[in-house]
Amino acid sequence: MAEKQLSQAAQWDHEFVWHPFTQMQDWLAQEPVVIERGEGVFLIDENGKKYYDGVSSLWVNIHGHNHPVLNQALKDQIDKIAHSTLLGLVSPPSAQLCKELVELAPEGLDKVFLSDDGSTAIEVAIKMAYQYRQQVGQTKKTKFIALNAGYHGDTLGTVSVGGIQLFHQVFHNLLFKPLTLPSPGVYADVADRDKAFEESLAELERILSEEGDEITALVMEPLVQAAAGMLVMPHGYLKRVRELTEEHDVFLIVDEVATGFCRTGKFFACEHEGVSPDFMTLSKGITGGYMPLAATLTTKRVFDAFLGTFEEKKTFYHGHSYTGNALACAVALASLKVFRDEKVIDQLPAKVEAFTKALEPIKSLKHVKEVRQRGLIVGIELEKDVATHEAYRPNDAVGAKVAILAREQGLICRPIGDVVILMPPLASTVEQLEDMVRIVGESIQRATEEEGLLEDLRPIIL
């Protein structure tokens, strides 16, 4: 049989593009899906085939593709100006966006530093927290605490506080070393969940009691450790972490890059436990999935420590060329307007309830270890033998098989190893959510129970 001719875009992709988190040897052996446009919760390829955007284009899309309000905001702004620097000038969209973010954020987060993506937002928080300690005379406070299985980005500072060895171990010699907590979401058996919760908090108490006067901040994802496979933290963990860090004057840096903007059912995941952190980072959904933008929110206490004369050298010397980009800020403002006008958060409880109900039959599938869910975020972990917890071998590529089979039925989902991920746009209807879950369930059943299926696939990691 003659080899199928790739489209021009696919040919150029294979010749010139290096994809993120992708083993390119495997990629170059495949015929890629070329997405030309989007409509609502659907992606549409160059042949006109429609796919549910089951992972919100890597957890960023909120209101669906081609939303008229967001489109119009970009058109209106481009007629004014695309970008002007925030170094020495004011940009109206960025000023208004910072105001609105503060109004939405947990109490006490009064200042906003804009950047470009989740990694930069955390990098800003790490540097601000460290510089603060130096400037107020707490020079011994140089250490950070991070969680095992945490993920905060790909820059060297964020990799330092990351806890996924597969991604980070090659850079070990370039990194600063944090104090590490066991994740409350990592356990061999669901029955061990409470034990994991208690052990993580006990270790935090020990670290703080022994080294608290040397620690700048604790960095964590609230409620869900996303890149580790949607590991859901037990209720009460975040609140207790906040209490302990406050007792020892350790900053809490909360990474809401994936969980922010209603993904968990509330506007910010912190709200579930009434927590106000010292730093909160936002990105992904901030522009509704339209453009790169990020924000690091912090307190007046932190901000005031950077005020002084030039000679005092208290300035925060950090920033990017496109910080506060007018187009990105304009569409972010439009996204917040859609949240208000379309009462997005009011519609979520019914959607989450339907999503939860639709997922219930998947729990009883032969090779499903656990279904982890928070709001419209779900991770379905697969095992070769659930009774003995025997894992699939990496080359079984069971998650990749599920993704390919789901794609054949019109759903784009990207697994993390053997964890099948769904994080659909908030704009999805109940019927669309139920259909996505149906496709995933059928694909899991086929991938795990049919012999000899798609044997040449390799694992997909994030």
PLM ranges: what are they?
Residues 2-462:
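Conserved N-terminal phosphate-binding loop of PLP-dependent enzymes in the Aspartate aminotransferase
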